[in-house]
UniProtKB/Swiss-Prot annotation:
This is Superoxide dismutase [Fe], chloroplastic. GO terms for cellular component: chloroplast nucleoid. The keyword DNA-binding does not apply. Homodimer. Its cofactor is Fe cation. It catalyses: 2 superoxide + 2 H(+) = H2O2 + O2. PANTHER family: SUPEROXIDE DISMUTASE, SUPEROXIDE DISMUTASE [FE] 2, CHLOROPLASTIC. It comes from the Eukaryota. It comes from Glycine max (Soybean).
């Protein structure tokens, strides 16, 4: 799994970033950390070929066209996301920038032979904050299943109280320093809310599952959690998030 380390402050928001890339001539479509047939038979090679090879690729190509020669040219992907979200008054580059980030993150959430149950501190926090691993699964699956239309469901670590500076219709604030389940419409991700460190996501746009599951989104969600999630990746992100919070 690629490193998700690093700390960047954009408009007062601290969050995990990937080291590079910038949106410039060197910004290219990043492949998943496994072959396109590596998730079979759970997720088909055909799904990866269309989802990564066409949808994700198009987001990258469109983003490069949108930012070249603008004030966003040369900024990091995360800076572009927060700036172009524009407190909910979304600017043209936002959707493609956020979808590039979301998909890079999503591919790293999965691995061949994934699923099962996490261990260590991650499991302890899940049991503390949700009551049990089963209750967490129920809440995450419900968030993903009930996201109307296109969007994403997330497990995130909330590091501080929500300040509302850069989001329209935010999730309700609650106590700090805990795991939370969120859902977001279209391309929106927790980076724009401030104080949320994404740990896990599932893509519930129809193109993510329709070739394999048709309209059976709940079945796709269950298979994702049971057979695809890389809990090692989620645990690593939790460790890095807590280290960043401590050093901020």
């Amino acid at each position: 799994m690629a490193s998700l380390g690093g700390l960047q402050n954009v408009s007062g928001i601290n969050f995990l970033i990937k080291e590079g890339p910038k949106v410039n001539a060197k910004f290219e479509l990043k492949p998943p950390p496994y072959p396109l047939n590596g998730l079979e038979p759970v997720m088909s090679q055909q799904t990866l070929e269309f989802h990564w090879g066409k949808h994700h690729k198009t987001y990258v190509e469109n983003l490069k066209k949108q930012v070249v020669g603008t004030e966003l040219d040369g900024k990091s992907l995360e800076e572009i996301i927060v700036t172009s979200y524009n407190k909910g008054d979304i600017l043209p580059a936002f959707n493609n920038a956020a979808q590039v980030w979301n998909h890079d993150f999503f591919w790293e959430c999965m691995k061949p032979g994934g699923g099962g149950k996490p261990s260590g501190e991650l499991l302890e926090l899940i049991e503390r904050d949700f009551g049990s691993f089963v209750k967490f699964l129920d809440e995450f699956k419900a968030a993903a299943a009930t996201q109307f239309g296109s969007g994403w469901a997330w497990l995130a670590y909330r590091a501080r109280k929500f300040d509302g500076e850069n989001v329209a219709n935010p999730p309700s604030p609650d106590e700090d320093n805990k795991l939370v389940v969120l859902k977001s419409p279209n391309a929106v991700n927790p980076l724009v809310w401030g104080g949320y460190y994404p740990l896990l996501t599932i893509d519930v746009w129809e193109h993510a599952y329709y070739l394999d599951f048709q309209n059976r989104r709940p079945d796709y969600i269950s298979v994702f959690m049971d057979k695809l999630v890389s809990w090692d990746a989620v645990s690593s992100r939790l460790e890095q998030a807590k280290a960043l919070i401590t050093s901020a």
